[in-house]
């Protein structure tokens, strides 16, 4: 793999035998050719330096070694066979060619006659630069989607006290991760659990129930006073929801009061928070819990869904689910009850939302293969940040061209005063960002870039 000669020892026996062999190897070496333990990532680094692997594939290999779920594994394997490095290099070569045209005019304009003025040449080059900027913009957007697969999707449960948020979390993760009680305000802080949902790594957070001082607890007839600890829990719950990628809004079927009929409870605090989340463009799924009490409402499930949709019309009906954590926990799958509590359909809805979040954007740009957008999901955070920096330099170049064009409309004599040196510098800086992506070419301090990548590997890789 490294491109160097390798000697492997296949040792039989326990740890003591391995330790003895390693000790013996240390004694057999000479001072001129010492033998030492490999540093983290050293074998992979040597493979890179010997041109056996490029830097984007090195990062994909690191993702493969740390993959926990199936979707993470697929993303990392895709990265090891994708053409990200060659694509970055082709973009860099395009910028080098564009920069060369500008610098030719800078260096030889006094000795040679050029058909185009500086502003005209820059305007001609800007067509390619604008196309590249658009490609990089969508590439970077897809990289953000890929990071959701790589780092995990943040999911929060939001609702009033006692609607069954903790029971829902326990049912999703398959164990008692959160305390379940009939007492209001049992959950005071965010309880976060990592779980594999359909191959997607998800960080699921249970939060404190939302209510105001003037609101009644769902299981009590009299008003409960909120203490300072619970107030802080409610504040953290709202903050957690705003930071999450997906929010599950939990309502429940409850009796309005002692002896009164059951109906869906949608408290003011919860609805206000939901509208704030919608304004922040958050992905919301609604779970209407305790549907085992549906018969006591005199309503059909479709009527309950319609009532929620009327209160929150921005949420489509296919993201509103009627469930029963009680039935899901107490019943087993069978031919008679294939989906107890409609819980499987609810989880499928969550997974479909995850797919929508992580499917690549395909802008259908002329002259591009659709496969590049799927591959762009594999771009790491380091690559995305460099792409964003590259875009900043490209936008600077385009802004200079636009300003010169606007000035030329006002005064024709200004056209020849376009500063090609500054424009060429913007293209050089953009090309250097692309070079740092692969660790090749004029990448500035490449050693610093490589150090960041390889130090994440364990010893022996």
Label each residue range with its predicted role.
Residues 1-154, 373-454, 458-461:
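Conserved P-loop NTPase architecture
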Residues 13-17, 53-55, 67, 185, ...:
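Conserved nucleotide-binding/hydrolysis micro-motifs of P-loop NTPases
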Residues 65, 113, 215-226, 278-280, ...:
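Mature, matrix/stroma-exposed regions of nuclear-encoded mitochondrial and chloroplast proteins
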Residues 101-241, 448, 456:
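Conserved G1/Walker A P-loop phosphate-binding module
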Residues 131, 283-285, 292-375:
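Canonical P-loop GTPase G-domain recognition
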Residues 200, 227, 231-319:
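Conserved C-terminal guanine-recognition region of P-loop GTPase G domains, centered on the G4
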Residues 216-225, 258-265, 272, 306, ...:
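Intrinsically disordered, low-complexity domain-flanking/linker segments in eukaryotic proteins
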Residues 230-233, 339, 423:
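Short, conserved glycine- and acidic-residue-centered signature motifs
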